[in-house]
């Protein structure tokens, strides 16, 4: 029999392939990577648009061949990665868009172990990244702890570090001409060493009179070469503000209209940013932040100012997310500042770069580059019906990539879901060549998202639940060896003997893996699809008389009669056979337990 890789003269092709108008099962058996990629690329289109092609793949062994391609593992070669991603996309299209019989065939083709391995690999990387971030933060806090001890005072009651500061200023004044005399306001009791007390704390037109001399004097001073104490940055800010009523908001007075317009401060914008002086500029909220850091006169803008400056609508009828129990009230007090583009206190060491005009990013809306246009495909929240002309396109695109609406960006500004990808955090400060080589074998965010979405569609059939609760990991897809190679101080691992997948016991329950993605440090889209999968676990089996299973994965007991187990009082969806199971499951169930009306 002729090999399919041999040439076919009548069609002038090197091998059999799939086109957008022709499906040939023999093309999936091609052993050459390039024509197989070409066929998979066209097959991804066919599985999206043609229900007949999806049905044919379930009976001619096409799904089994695609799953075999996935189980071969992800290689570091670019062409192999491309082939793996296209095959995975085809299987997801078949499972998501197919009928019940087609989805059943996807599960029976042993696709669940592939998904379980992808989710487990991602969880391992996230756990290592969080552990590494916690250790680094602990080291930094312990390193800066001795510096936070108050300095001893001399006999006159003046702190010793102020004496050293004045002595350093005297030595500097001998080497260069003194700067112009500027009126200095009264010093607070605990003033920050690194805060320049040369700028008078007056109204905005008077604050815009400082020149470049102040910056030149600071750059020549050796006291600003090292990072300053972060613990003392709050005190000068509190003392620099005039006395005010603490009854409303955070003790901040409402900002006047002449202060909230960026066009009222033309001198402060020169050299700091190239954006036009307009309240609708997308990066307008960053400008008051830089001004406040340079002058230490922090006037917090109101809620209406931040919404108008970022291009968002002032109305409060944005949609309530399906993942949150709390809804944003329509009427909000004026001085509330807990928004996405609020002005937090950064490290004082970064003020040099801000005043000097150095291009250093201080945006708070950190987005993962991998969550760009692709993530929009899996956006699951319902958009708000506000006028689109009032929404900033830049902010809306960033929020859409995370599955959020612009009206809800304020509620989740400080959510850990806005952190960069765990891979970028984990591979930071590591060998670039080794990190990039291992990164290619790890699942991407979109792979995890598509896996959860596929599970959400196939897990709602109770007759397939045994496939999810009794699964295993694919040995060629596991990344334990790659992760251990990146650990500091570890020797290269000898390649272990390859395990036979069909000899592994089916002792992996995929639902506990999915439940970990309901935690809030994952993206909103991952949380949504993971919650859908967990709610499918609580479905009653109509084929067995409408009985339900205990929602605690270590129990798994089924009801003997309908309505035997008690439901969760909050969500009215999950059932537990006992109080002990409910208490044990609450560790993760609280993340996807949402009250029903």
Curated annotation (Swiss-Prot):
Pfam families: zf-MYND. Residues 271-284 have a biased composition (Polar residues). GO terms for biological process: establishment or maintenance of cell polarity; positive regulation of flocculation; sporulation resulting in formation of a cellular spore; ubiquitin-dependent protein catabolic process. The keyword Zinc-finger applies. Zn(2+) binds at residues 568, 571, 589, 593. One of its GO terms (cellular component) is cytoplasm. Residues 133-230, 268-287, 292-341 are annotated as: Disordered. A zinc finger (MYND-type) spans 552-593. Residues 312-328 have a biased composition (Acidic residues). Residues 177-188 have a biased composition (Pro residues). InterPro entries: ARM-type_fold (IPR016024), MYND-type_zinc_finger (IPR051664), Znf_MYND (IPR002893). It comes from the Eukaryota. Keywords: Cytoplasm, Metal-binding, Sporulation, Zinc, Zinc-finger. It is found in: Cytoplasm. Residues 214-224 have a biased composition (Basic and acidic residues). GO terms for molecular function: zinc ion binding. Belongs to the MUB1/samB family. Involved in determination of the onset of polarized growth and morphogenesis. Plays a role in the regulation of branching in hyphae and spore formation. PANTHER family: MYND-TYPE ZINC FINGER PROTEIN MUB1. This is MYND-type zinc finger protein samB. It comes from Aspergillus clavatus (strain ATCC 1007 / CBS 513.65 / DSM 816 / NCTC 3887 / NRRL 1 / QM 1276 / 107). The lineage of its organism: Eukaryota, Fungi, Dikarya, Ascomycota, Pezizomycotina.
């Amino acid at each position: 029999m002729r090999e399919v890789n041999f040439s076919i003269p009548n069609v002038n092709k090197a091998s059999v392939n799939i086109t957008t108008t022709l499906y040939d099962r023999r093309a999936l058996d091609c052993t050459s990577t390039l024509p197989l990629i070409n066929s998979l690329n066209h097959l991804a289109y066919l599985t999206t648009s043609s229900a007949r092609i999806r049905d044919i793949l379930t009976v001619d062994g096409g799904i089994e061949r695609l799953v075999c391609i996935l189980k071969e593992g992800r290689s570091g070669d670019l062409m192999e990665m491309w082939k793996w991603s296209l095959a995975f996309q085809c299987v997801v299209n078949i499972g998501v868009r197919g009928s019940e019989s087609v989805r059943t065939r996807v599960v029976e083709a042993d696709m669940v172990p592939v998904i379980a391995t992808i989710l487990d690999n991602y969880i391992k990387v996230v756990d290592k990244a969080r552990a590494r971030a916690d250790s680094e933060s602990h080291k930094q806090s312990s390193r800066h702890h001795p510096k936070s001890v108050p300095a001893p005072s001399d006999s006159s009651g003046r702190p010793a570090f102020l004496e050293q500061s004045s002595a350093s200023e005297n030595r500097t004044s001998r080497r260069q001409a003194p700067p112009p005399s500027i009126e200095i306001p009264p010093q607070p009791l605990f003033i920050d060493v690194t805060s320049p007390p040369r700028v008078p704390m007056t109204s905005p037109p008077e604050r815009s009179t400082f020149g470049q001399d102040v910056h030149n004097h600071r750059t020549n001073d050796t006291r600003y070469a090292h990072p300053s104490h972060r613990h003392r940055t709050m005190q000068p800010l509190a003392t620099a503000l005039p006395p005010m009523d603490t009854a409303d908001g955070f003790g901040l007075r409402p900002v006047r209209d002449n202060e909230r317009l960026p066009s009222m401060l033309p001198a402060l914008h020169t050299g700091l940013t190239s954006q036009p002086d307009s309240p609708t500029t997308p990066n307008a909220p960053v400008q008051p932040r830089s001004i406040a850091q340079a002058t230490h006169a922090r006037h917090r803008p109101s809620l209406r100012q931040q919404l108008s400056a970022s291009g968002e609508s002032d109305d409060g009828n944005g949609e309530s997310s399906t993942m949150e129990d709390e809804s944003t009230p329509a009427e909000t007090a004026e001085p509330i500042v807990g928004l996405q583009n609020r002005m937090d206190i950064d490290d004082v060491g970064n003020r040099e770069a801000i005043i000097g005009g150095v291009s250093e990013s201080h945006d708070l809306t950190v987005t993962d580059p991998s969550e760009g246009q692709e993530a929009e495909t899996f956006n699951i929240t319902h958009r708000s019906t506000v006028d689109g002309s009032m929404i900033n396109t830049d902010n809306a695109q960033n929020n859409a990539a995370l599955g959020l609406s612009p009206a809800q960006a304020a509620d989740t500004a400080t959510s850990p879901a806005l952190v960069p990808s765990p891979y970028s955090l984990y591979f930071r400060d590591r060998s670039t060549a080794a990190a990039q080589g291992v990164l290619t074998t790890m699942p991407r965010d979109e792979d995890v998202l598509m896996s959860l979405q596929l599970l959400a569609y196939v897990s709602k059939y109770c007759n397939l639940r045994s496939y999810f609760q009794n699964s295993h990991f694919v040995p060629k897809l596991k990344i334990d060896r790659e992760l251990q190679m990146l650990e500091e101080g570890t020797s290269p691992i000898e390649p272990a003997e390859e395990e036979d997948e069909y000899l592994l016991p089916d002792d992996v329950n995929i639902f506990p893996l999915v439940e970990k993605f309901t935690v809030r440090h994952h993206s909103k889209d991952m949380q949504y699809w993971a919650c859908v999968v967990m709610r499918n676990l609580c479905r009653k089996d109509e084929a067995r008389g409408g009985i339900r299973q205990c929602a605690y994965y270590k129990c798994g007991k089924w009801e003997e009669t309908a309505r035997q187990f008690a439901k969760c009082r909050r969500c009215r969806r999950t059932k537990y056979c006992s109080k002990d199971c409910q208490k044990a499951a609450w560790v993760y169930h609280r993340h996807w337990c949402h009250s029903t009306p």
